[in-house]
Amino acid sequence: MHKGELTNVNPPRITTEPFNHGWLKTYHTFSFANYYNPRRIHFGALRVLNDDRISPGEGFDMHPHKNMEVVSIPLKGYLKHGDSIENQSIITPGEIQVMSTGKGIYHSEYNGSNEKDLELLQIWIIPNKEETEPEYHNYNILPLMKHNELATFISPNGNTPAHLLQDAWFSMGTLSANHKVSYHLHKPHTGVYFFIIEGNVDIADENLTRRDGIGIWDTESIIIKTNEESQVLAIEVAL
């Protein structure tokens, strides 16, 4: 088993880098925008993992994306989406949105509330096909969620509500305190990045707390042990 980042020799436990833009408070796991760390470029096909907090009524105006799979997971509040292929939607916790940007798409993202902050994770995955037709979908994943399990809601095939143009599996769940769960990797040449949304867990002899992460590869399975009630996101990707 290897743990840590594929491109560095840093300690395995990865913390996020904070940036405050007033209306946007964001925490970057990997190099993004004004944050650059040559040791934190990507974890295999996982290129971006941003933890954003957007003030009421604020957001990102129309801007382009190309040849990237973009997954947005709202944690609190209302995420308002619009794009250049005529999609308009508002999604809330328990739902996700997936954009396959392909040969190009413009989109906007706003806090759909004028009163409360929006908290969301935005994740970019490098696709295994480029210049495809752009697509947008949103999905209700709440029926999949079962207490004390990591439920898989994105995969490369039709076994889950959502899929990506990549060998990528997204799983998430809320686990009770003092609980153990085993995560089994889907393929020999993938790695899994665990992101602790809330709580305190032990993974591969590392203690991880809220918004910490760790990447693991060269193993078939990993045990997650919780020290308190915890919400965990697992992103398994091609290396």
Annotate each PLM feature.
Residues 1-239:
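Jelly-roll (double-stranded beta-helix
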